[in-house]
Every structure is written in structure tokens, then in C-alpha cells.
Amino acid sequence: MPQKLILASTSPYRRELLSRLGLAFDVANPQTDESPIFGESPESMALRLSEAKARAAAQAYPDALIIGSDQVATVNGNIYGKPGTHERAVKQLRELSGKTVNFFTGLCLLNARTGEAEVRGIPTLVTFRELTDSEIDNYLRREPAYNCAGSAKSEGLGIALMSSMRGDDPNALVGLPLIALCDMLRKQSLGVL
């Protein structure tokens, strides 16, 4: 019997990206503590949390293939998470103005039946233009990116804040690296094509 595919995320962006592959899947809320561990690197945190989300969903889906993903944005070791409010988003964008940000996306595919997990990290470097307060305010009023690490949606109007982007998979920046995921699914005998 083929294994059910589960996306361990409540993110509408990840759900939309996964739906592009044309595979049937269900969504699970992973209920994971996303607090950083003292001394943990941002990259290690994203990898740990992507696997933790998949393993949390395995409690309800012990026979499934489960996808977990997590993303952190960093500049000089400082982590920029989801701002949550307009004021924090303004502060983040002021701090990121003119800087290159490392968006690191952790991806896990867990075979809950066997307990085996494959975990990968996909970096994307984004350079923000020098932003004026007026541009920041106009952007956030038109596209309140309060639930996005770094306060900008590259798949929307946020692209206007950026001067360059470097990475292997543009989907990684949105939160689900589809190139790596397709490879991982093939290894589990679930080909997309």
C-alpha cells in the first residue's frame, strides 16, 4: 500500500508550493517548540526544527512520508524571524537595508514507517537594496509580511526590496525547496513524474 504524504506545516506558502507537484497530500500541525537551543547555530536550528516538525507529525501518521521544513534568516549571526507586528517588520527591514541576508531552509523527509529521515539545508543569499523609510512603510502597507522571516515576500511585492538573489532553488526562499524535495521523494519511490 502506498504511503500517505503529509506536510508537517500550517504555512499556506508551503502548502501552495507542494501542491505545484500535483501529489495528493494532507496537512498536519506539527505542534513543535521552535525555541533556539543555547549555542546552536542558525543553520543547525533550521535542520533540527525541520526534523522535529516531521517527527511530531509522525505521532498521528505512523505509516506516512512526512515533510518538515523550517527557515531562518541571518545577518552576521543575528537571527531574523517572523516579525509578527508592523513595528517589528519596520525595524527588521531598516536593519536589513543594504545588507546580504542568508535565508537557510531546513528540509526533512521522514519515512515514519521505518523511522529514517533525510535532512538537507538549502541556503539562499538575498541582498536588500538601500531602503527608505517611505519604501518600507509603503511595502508593509501593501503587503504586510508579518509572518515571513526577514519581513519580505520574494514571491510577491517584496521582490522590489531586493537587488539580487543567489541560490539553487527559488522555492527555498518561499519555504519549501522543491528541487531537493523531488530528489528525496524519488529515493522513497514516490516519483513526481
UniProtKB/Swiss-Prot annotation:
Which GO terms of the cellular component aspect does the record hold? cytoplasm
Q: What class of enzyme is it?
A: hydrolase
Q: Which GO terms label this protein's molecular function in UniProt?
A: nucleoside triphosphate diphosphatase activity
Q: Which reaction does it catalyse?
A: N(7)-methyl-GTP + H2O = N(7)-methyl-GMP + diphosphate + H(+)
**One GO BP annotation of this record:** nucleotide metabolic process
Q: What is its EC number?
A: 3.6.1.-
Keyword terms, alphabetized? Cytoplasm, Hydrolase, Nucleotide metabolism
List the protein's name. Answer: 7-methyl-GTP pyrophosphatase
